[in-house]
């Protein structure tokens, strides 16, 4: 089942438990990253389920039983799921004997910085939660405003999209201070279910080793964008057609073998650990004892454009830019699309936003375009063949824009793929 043949085919009441919305306590909506937003009924019971899954993360990785914690929820509030979900689940975790104070400034840089400045000194640590591009912006904005992140015991809980290891390294350098594996944690979720899986020190260490290893441990492991561990008792995955993920979960709408539109795979803990000898150098002191199955993601199958019949994936472009020597001069936001020229040829276009204080220049535009052209050929042999076949017409057309030009709507994921004009 999927959104088209199940969710959109029937009324909201028909697909809800017992054919009614009476068991629901509130509504959340999807971000609309792949289509029109949709409303999802949720209950307090499902928030408690999420709380149970997040509790080991808080207590074992963030040590919240012993460490007083200021949790700053900078996910979008309102009807969008993440803000309320993490607010409710974290309050439940606090009620289980964890010294956590929860604040919810939402997607507001100034308010987020104001609350962290006001309360961080009263707690042993700060956990800042939000969408990766927004949190990166908060960190940069805070540094400019004089916030000494390096003097603060701050951890980041990020959700909404996977993060690459170069991106993690870049953000750790912006934060300064300890470079611990548990300092930046990415979580995976969907509007349909809320929270699904999270990174652990073990999954992060394995992901970093995989990127540097020639060992063939997972199918297409060079494409892995997210590497998590999950709780199969409450989030059960199956893989069909090689890399299509099906999820069964207790949500506001019953989901049975639901097609997530994410591609990837699952791996048994014991099977992965048997391969550990191939992955030398895992820091045993940090990985802990996370005996849970692994979930790896290549990305959403629909976050791409078709260029001369080739699929050009957002994830590959993000990875290329994050590995560039000029990444600090970029905000991290871009859009991609394929346009038709006056000669009816296709043209691959990127609009890339610069970081605060940077101005577009012809020289910089040329550098970015050449770098992307080179990196995309490294990523895709098909694109390399296309470059040979059509020459300069395969070269990306890059437009650099000042900071703030690419706007994001609060609560909605950034639309990496723009519509053609």
Task: List the model feature ranges, each with a label.
Residues 1-69, 73, 118, 122, ...:
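Nucleotide 5′-phosphate-binding alpha/beta core
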Residues 43-57, 70-136:
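AMP-binding/adenylate-forming
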Residues 60-67, 93-96, 121-125, 144-152, ...:
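Secondary-structure boundary elements
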Residues 73-77, 159-160, 248-249:
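Short beta-strand->loop
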Residues 84-94, 142-145, 167-176, 364-370:
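Short, aromatic/basic amphipathic alpha-helical patches
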Residues 107-114, 124-170, 174, 183-192:
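Adenylate-forming
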Residues 111, 142-147, 158, 232-240, ...:
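AMP-binding adenylation
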Residues 163, 169-282:
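Conserved AMP-binding/adenylate-forming
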């Amino acid at each position: 089942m999927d959104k088209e043949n199940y969710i959109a085919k029937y009324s909201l009441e028909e697909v809800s438990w017992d054919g009614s919305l009476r068991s629901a306590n509130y509504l959340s909506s999807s971000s609309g990253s792949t289509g029109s937003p949709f409303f999802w009924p949720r209950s307090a019971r499902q928030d408690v389920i999420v709380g149970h899954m997040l509790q080991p993360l808080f207590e074992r990785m963030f040590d919240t039983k012993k460490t007083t914690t200021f949790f700053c929820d900078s996910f979008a509030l309102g009807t969008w799921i993440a803000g309320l979900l993490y607010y409710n689940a974290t309050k439940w975790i606090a009620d289980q004997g964890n010294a956590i104070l929860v604040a919810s400034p939402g997607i507001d840089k100034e308010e987020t910085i104001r609350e962290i400045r006001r309360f961080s000194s009263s707690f042993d640590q700060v956990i800042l939660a939000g969408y990766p591009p927004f949190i990166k912006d908060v960190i940069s904005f805070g540094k400019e405003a004089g916030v000494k992140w390096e003097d603060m015991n701050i951890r980041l809980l990020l959700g909404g999209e996977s993060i690459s290891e170069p991106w993690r390294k870049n953000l750790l350098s912006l934060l300064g201070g300890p470079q611990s594996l548990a300092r930046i944690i990415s979580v995976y979720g969907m509007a349909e279910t809320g929270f699904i899986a999270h990174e652990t020190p073990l999954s992060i260490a394995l992901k970093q080793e995989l990127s540097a290893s020639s060992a063939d441990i997972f199918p297409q492991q060079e494409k892995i964008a997210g590497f998590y561990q999950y709780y199969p008792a409450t989030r059960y995955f199956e893989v069909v057609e090689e890399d299509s993920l099906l999820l069964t979960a207790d949500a506001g709408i019953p989901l049975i073998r639901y097609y997530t539109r994410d591609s990837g795979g699952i791996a048994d803990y014991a099977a992965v650990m048997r391969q550990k000898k191939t992955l030398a150098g895992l820091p045993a002191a940090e990985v802990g004892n996370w005996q849970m199955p692994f979930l790896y993601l290549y990305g959403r199958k629909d976050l791409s454009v078709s260029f001369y019949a080739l699929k050009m994936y957002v994830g590959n472009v993000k990875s290329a830019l994050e590995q560039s020597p000029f990444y600090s001069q970029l905000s991290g936001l871009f859009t991609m699309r394929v346009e038709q020229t006056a000669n009816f040829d296709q043209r691959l276009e990127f609009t890339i936003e610069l970081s605060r204080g940077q101005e577009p220049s012809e020289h910089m535009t040329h550098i970015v375009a050449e770098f992307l052209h080179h990196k995309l050929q490294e990523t895709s042999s098909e694109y390399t063949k296309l470059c040979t076949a059509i020459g300069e017409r395969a070269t990306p057309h890059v437009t650099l824009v000042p900071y703030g030009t690419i706007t994001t709507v609060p609560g909605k994921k950034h639309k990496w793929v723009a519509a053609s004009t």
